[in-house]
A protein has these predicted regions:
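Conserved positions at the start
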Residues: 85-87, 149-151, 208-211, 279-281, ...
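Beta-rich carbohydrate-recognition and catalytic domains
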Residues: 27-145, 155-207, 215-273, 286-351, ...
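Acidic/polar low-complexity flexible segments
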Residues: 440-451, 505-534, 573-616
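Sec-dependent signal peptide recognition
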Residues: 2-9
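C-terminal motif of bacterial Sec signal peptides marking the signal peptidase cleavage site
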Residues: 15-18
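Extracellular/luminal beta-rich ligand-recognition
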Residues: 334-337, 495-562, 615
Length: 616
């Protein structure tokens, strides 16, 4: 039987000067147990209030991505239909379900068939078979050949239609300019969330890889891809595009015509003693509240004699009106083109920003951009500003080693990240997970009764998240009235221990280091365990804080599955230095299974790296 325990600790007011070195946790006065069922709101159901577009563009550098450990899923061969799935891509449909695509590892990972699977929750996946299946053809040379498919990519249009693309190539003709039109891109459409699909049809002809698509506010579609020139070099690329003004029914400039060339720069291949084009594997977004497009690309950097190609990450931006300046001039077979002096573009770009490959780019509605890329078999992510021009430090979250990672938005405060996981060469699959966006939140303005009942928090849904170490996870919400600042911490935990606890840290919004105005409140399953300030270390001090804890669990009993616990906390305004209606906060969850799990490491001494709470 799950039981509810309510712990209440009310510390008598004492002089702020009255403090002592922190001693053992004091615990709290026990209130008789009573049965209940707690309703704990998961992070994905919070932050539902609509913020203004780019609401956090000015403080993007304080935003933090946090792994949601519970969301980690490994999708294997039994689902994807191939023993070594590669180049995974996920698209979220209009009905809230998901499609995962991947191709097989044929020809060193270049692929022959694109497989797909569906899910309603990102956890349970249903195999759907082949979306673009390799097939026998007679090529232009009169040979028995095979049309091979690779790089599946999906996009949901504003009308709910799903467009799926795959690059194709034909054996025996791929490396020849004369037969370039036996390669290209095919598309399929679904108007019923993937239940049925149109027959594939060609939207572009010419060697290519890694197509992605954008839809602008006017409904115009732009399909970008790595344009390949294999008759010259396998490392001779650049990003080109075709476009549609009728929802993807027809594409310009038309089959058999050279594409619109939009992004490329030159590099020197010492191995072949050639100048070549680069900027491939495009990842593009239309920036919030703008028509400007920002793109990230894999760029060949150098190919030393006796070595291998080294890749880096590059960026490019369209003009503000979103219209690229096309790189004019027919190339034909390219033999008469002096690549070293050839036209490149666009003018607004950054080349060789970091070492890496296979990038992806997204933007949250609140303004933060996120770039991902691969390096040394790991996926790395960086948070950037609202123009995708400045980025913070790189961090890795996905618990996998492999290649061809990607990211996509899932709501306003989460992203999905995934990649081919080849850590175990005998069990290759796709590993995916969610990351939560922790950024500035607003306190709701209302009085909270500190009784362990979270019903008075219904209209306070700005929330922070901790939960990267194990299945135990916590959210934090804030409210305030004229007398107190309130916090609700909800902990979802399948195995609650009597020794679990949370810590809420509070600092003035202008504090650059921990000091005597930095507060900490520690709350465990028996109520308020400790409270105090920082003076070289944490000093116990009566802040007048109150806490009530309730749990829906059998404590320290692993034989069943618990729901979790919550804590309502109040801190008098008189104990908190509020600057311009703001404070800095940090949340740390200690769970016996995963240890300490904080939004920002509790070893961080600069509160400016904590999260801002406004509305105070």
């Amino acid at each position: 039987m799950n039981k509810l325990y309510t712990g209440l600790a009310l510390l008598a007011a004492v002089s702020l000067a009255s403090c002592k070195t922190e001693g053992p946790d004091d615990g709290g006065k026990q209130i008789p147990s009573e049965s209940t069922t707690l309703t704990l709101t998961p992070f994905e159901k919070l932050n539902a209030s609509a913020d203004a577009v780019n609401s956090h563009k000015d403080d993007w550098a304080q935003s933090v991505l946090t792994l949601n450990y519970r969301s980690i899923v490994n999708v294997g061969a039994s689902v994807l239909g191939t023993d070594s799935p590669s180049y995974s891509r996920i698209v979220k449909l209009a009905d809230g379900s998901y499609i995962l695509t991947a191709h097989d590892f044929y020809s060193g990972g270049n692929g022959s068939t694109v497989y797909w699977a569906t899910s309603k929750d990102l956890v349970n996946w249903t195999p759907q078979g082949k979306l673009f299946a390799s097939r026998s053809v007679v090529n232009a040379r009169g040979q028995e050949a095979t049309r091979l498919y690779t790089n599946g990519f999906g996009k949901v249009l504003s009308n709910g239609d799903v467009l799926m693309f795959a690059s194709f190539r034909t054996t025996g003709t791929y490396s020849f300019w004369k037969w370039r039109y036996e390669q290209g891109i095919e598309m399929r459409r679904s108007t019923d969330n993937g239940k049925t699909w149109s027959e594939p049809y060609e939207v572009y002809r010419g060697p290519n890889w890694e197509a992605i698509m954008l839809e602008d506010s006017a409904g115009e579609l732009e399909l970008y891809f790595s344009e390949s020139r294999p008759w010259i070099s396998g490392s001779h690329s650049g990003t080109s595009m075709v476009r549609s003004t009728d929802g993807g029914k027809t594409w310009l400039p038309g089959l058999g015509k050279e594409p619109y060339r939009v992004i490329r720069h030159t590099w020197y291949d010492a191995h072949q003693d050639k100048w070549l084009f680069t900027d491939q594997m495009p990842g593009l977004v239309i920036l919030n509240d703008s028509k400007c497009k920002a793109g990230v690309f894999e760029s060949a950097h150098d190919y030393p004699v006796g070595g291998s190609v080294n890749f880096s990450i590059s960026f490019a931006w369209s003009p503000e009106d979103g219209n690229w300046n096309y790189i004019e001039g027919e190339e034909k077979d390219g033999t008469g083109l002096d690549v070293k002096t050839a036209k490149v573009g666009p003018a607004d770009r950054k080349i060789d920003v970091w070492n890496g490959s296979a990038p992806s780019l997204l933007q949250f509605p609140s303004g933060e951009t996120v770039v991902s890329y691969g390096q040394d078999t790991y996926q790395w992510l960086r948070i950037g500003d609202s123009r995708a021009r400045n980025f913070g430090a790189a961090a890795k979250y996905l618990p996998a080693k492999g290649s061809w990672s990607s990211i996509l938005l899932d709501g306003t405060h989460e992203l999905i990240t995934h990649m081919r996981n080849s850590t175990d060469s005998k069990n290759v699959g796709v590993t995916l997970c969610k990351l939560a966006l922790n950024h500035r939140i607003a306190a709701s303005s209302h009085k909270v009764v500190i009784d362990g009942n979270n019903s008075d928090w219904v209209n306070a849904d700005d929330a922070l998240f901790a939960g990267s170490k194990c299945q135990a996870q916590a959210t934090l919400r804030c409210a305030a009235d004229a007398d107190n600042i309130y916090f609700l911490v909800e902990c979802r935990d399948e195995n609650v221990s009597k020794d679990d606890y949370v810590q809420v840290f509070i600092a003035p919004s202008d504090a650059a280091k921990l000091n005597a105005q930095t507060l900490r409140v520690k709350v465990g399953l028996n109520g308020l365990r400790n409270q105090g300030v920082y003076a070289g270390n944490w000093i116990e001090k009566d802040l007048g804080a109150k806490a009530v804890v309730r749990y829906d669990a059998t404590l320290s009993d692993a034989s069943d599955v618990d729901n979790g616990w919550l804590a309502e906390i109040s801190v008098p305004r008189s104990s908190v230095k509020v600057v311009d209606g703001k404070v800095k906060v940090n949340l740390a969850l200690f769970d016996m299974e995963g240890g300490e799990d904080a939004i920002v490491s509790t070893g961080e001494k600069n509160p400016q790296k904590w999260i801002t709470v406004t509305g105070l």
